Amino acid sequence: VKDGFLNCLIDKDPKREGFFMTGGIAHKKNYTYGKFEFRIRMDEDPHKSSSGLGLTWPESEKWPDDGENDIYETAHEDNTWNANIHYAVSGKDQKYQQTFHYNKSDWHIVAMEWTPEYIKIYIDNKLVWDLKDPVAITKAPHHLCFQTEKDINKPFTKALKLQVDWAKVYKYVPKK
């Protein structure tokens, strides 16, 4: 944390030539359903070799069986990001993916509402995706994570960061 932001870095490892350091952090509390919301941005990468993520990951660590909800996953190739909902069919990874054409280096408020009936993705308080496939919606407890990734086969010239200004998690309360 620096200057009031969570900074997940990507940089060259100063102690090991040819290696990179990437950052990540995970919330300790797990939730089954809820709303996950955060204000986030990712540095533009001139070499198109990195990615930043805001996601939920299963408490069980059983992937893909217990799902993965990539709420914000920046693309390596361009200045966009995706939401990916991973789930398993016969133990094999399947996913729904939606691409968003917003500048990833600008600040955005991104949210996911996750209920037994749907997953909804919001960008800057606007609903942009509504997924209602019950097979794809995990019932397993998940926790919020932020992380960075680096394609080691592509060039790298400067440190990059995924920044999070704030994050909120709202507990799911079933309707009566």
Predicted features along the sequence, with ranges:
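GH16 jelly-roll
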Residues: 1-176
